[in-house]
A protein has these predicted regions:
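N-terminal module-boundary/linker segments of secreted carbohydrate-active enzymes
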Residues: 1-40, 152-154, 166-168, 173-180, ...
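Short, acidic/polar
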Residues: 70-82, 228-248
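Active-site-proximal helices and loops of the catalytic beta/alpha 8
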Residues: 133, 240-243, 247-314
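Short acidic catalytic loops
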Residues: 88-96, 112, 145-154, 237-238, ...
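Aromatic- and acidic-residue-enriched segments that line the glycan-binding/catalytic groove
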Residues: 32, 53-56, 101-115, 152-210, ...
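Extracellular/periplasmic catalytic domains that process cell-envelope and extracellular macromolecules
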Residues: 28-33, 84-87, 92, 133-141, ...
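Short, solvent-exposed turn/loop segments enriched in Gly/Ser/Thr/Pro and often Arg
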Residues: 41-43, 92-102, 148-159, 258-263, ...
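N-terminal structural segment of carbohydrate-active enzymes
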Residues: 2-145, 155, 214-216
């Protein structure tokens, strides 16, 4: 009889020791050789077989903007053949973690330690990764890698400023904290610390420091990831969270969201520690890449190179 263990709720609950008896997946194929298929989980497919819609028919029913449509992890597992037939060798998943209501895209996270029920379960994710790693095409091994989209710059809209007002960045001023929107979120519980957030209000200048590294992206609350004791606590917690998901799901890489809004040192520490942990599991080719959207070459240059240009971390 299989006993399902509850999801952890604290950093202290996370077991990062390799799963006994498990051989973690590794393939020495160059990442530059991969053909990566990106999909938004909710918009891809569920596990139900459907005919292709014709004319004005909609295979997913009535379209409701800014809401979930029903795609899930089992639907991806069921359609690995389709992805392989396109010639793809790796799958990049949108964030799988539990989100606030209506956040079908996955970037409004309120629980980093559990899979969003709209998408399935942790076991569904494990099964998908296992199926991708062991996939066969035309009777021959065709291992596909799986990449998770991860967020380390901000949490979801899990708390509000005092008075419930909408604050905007101004002269790097810290604004007063109101309260968390739910008594049981965010998770892990360590994220229920108002000092772990910059609290500068919404940014309007997305390309110039310090606003672009201290301000909130719309309602998403920016983590305090500066080079100080608080920032070290935040980034260390995020490192452990994502090491946990490598251990549990055996994923092969991370795409890091909103990199230009993260301090260079925090980004370097995260990247180096993630790669080192993956290596201890035998995953020698763990891949990390990040999102930078900017017209400024200077911003790109700050994050290019081994561990970035400010990688003097201890």
């Amino acid at each position: 009889m299989e006993i399902l263990m509850p999801d952890p709720i604290s950093i202290g609950d996370l077991d990062l020791v390799p799963i006994p008896g498990k051989t973690y997946f590794n393939i020495d194929r160059e990442w530059r050789e991969e053909f990566i298929y990106f999909l938004l989980i909710d918009r891809f497919q569920d596990e139900v077989s459907r005919q292709i819609a014709t004319g004005s028919a909609r295979s997913f029913g009535v379209v409701t903007p800014n809401n979930f449509y029903g795609g899930n992890i089992k639907g991806i597992t069921r359609n690995l053949e389709y992805i392989a037939r396109l010639g793809c060798t790796a799958i990049w998943l949108s964030p799988v973690f539990e989100n606030n209501p209506g956040a079908y895209h996955g970037y409004d996270i309120n629980n980093y330690l559990g899979v969003d029920p709209h998408f399935g379960t942790k076991q569904d994710l494990i099964d998908l990764v296992d199926a991708a790693h062991s996939f066969q095409k035309d009777g021959h091994p065709y291992p596909m890698r799986v990449i998770l989209d991860v967020v380390i710059n901000d949490s979801g809209d899990n708390w509000f400023y005092r008075g419930g007002f909408r604050y905007f960045y101004f002269n790097d001023q810290i604004f007063p904290f109101g309260d968390f929107r739910r008594p049981d979120r965010p998770l892990p519980i360590e994220l229920r610390n108002s000092d772990w957030y910059h609290r500068r209000g919404e940014m309007r200048d997305y390309d110039h420091a310090p606003e672009n590294q201290h301000g909130d992206i719309l309602a998403l609350k920016d983590y305090a990831n500066d080079d100080d004791p608080i920032g070290s606590g935040v980034i260390n917690a995020l490192i452990k969270i994502y090491c946990y998901w490598i251990r549990e799901a055996d994923v092969d890489g991370f795409r890091v969201d909103a990199v230009k809004h993260i301090g260079e040192l925090a980004c370097a520490r995260f990247s180096s520690n993630i790669r080192e942990y993956a290596y201890t599991l035998g995953k020698r080719q763990f891949f990390l890449f990040g999102e930078i959207a900017s017209p400024s070459d200077d911003i790109y240059n700050r994050y290019i190179g081994q561990n970035t240009s400010k990688a003097g971390w201890q």
